[in-house]
Amino acid sequence: MCAEVGPALCRGMERNSLGCCEAPKKLSLSFSIEAILKRPARRSDMDRPEGPGEEGPGEAAASGSGLEKPPKDQPQEGRKSKRRVRTTFTTEQLHELEKIFHFTHYPDVHIRSQLAARINLPEARVQIWFQNQRAKWRKQEKIGNLGAPQQLSEASVALPTNLDVAGPTWTSTALRRLAPPTSCCPSAQDQLASAWFPAWITLLPAHPWETQPVPGLPIHQTCIPVLCILPPPHPKWGSICATST
């Protein structure tokens, strides 16, 4: 049959018949890991040298996000120069400064310059010292003003406890209620008065702390006197009136 058809066509038919029976060959990859590692590394866009006006993709992303990193390589000398140098005053300098502050809290430029030349300090340091001293003075004044009303309030609240020395305190209205009735005769009233109010009765002012005696002048009580009585047994009004009549 191959002679009739031809040798080329016969070989093709045999090849097709063999391909149907055999398993398909595995596709071979055109690259392998070993081949990739052996290849020379090509430069990427990240490693490409940039011109003075060009920005890399990393820098463009950082600038687009708005995040700026602080410079780490800032010299330490610049940091130290920002710190304020504290001035140590001597005793003589403090004495001169406090003397002027006692005279005036707000010295003008001429006084500050003269004082700075006298104590051998720059005028700016003298001005700063006066500012700090004024702040301390205002703070002390505020503390003093806050403490004064508290002391006054405590003194006003504290009242003397030993006011009643001779006995219970009786007001004038209470004494009027204890007075004998007017229907009794005068002699009975005298007896009641002598029996009811003994001779050792004492008069004390209603508020002893309000009256202060002045040396050389008679004492005048400016408030209503209060009778301090040690009450004796109460007499019976009926028996006294009956005996008097």
Swiss-Prot record:
One of its GO terms (biological process) is regulation of transcription by RNA polymerase II. Its main location: nucleus. Keywords: Activator, DNA-binding, Homeobox, Nucleus, Transcription, Transcription regulation. Residues 42-51, 69-79 have a biased composition (Basic and acidic residues). The keyword Electron transport does not apply. GO terms for molecular function: DNA-binding transcription factor activity, RNA polymerase II-specific; RNA polymerase II transcription regulatory region sequence-specific DNA binding; sequence-specific double-stranded DNA binding. One of its GO terms (cellular component) is nucleus. It is found in: Nucleus. Disulfide bonds: none annotated. Gene3D superfamilies: Homeodomain-like. PANTHER family: HOMEOBOX PROTEIN ARISTALESS, INTESTINE-SPECIFIC HOMEOBOX. This is Intestine-specific homeobox. The gene is ISX.
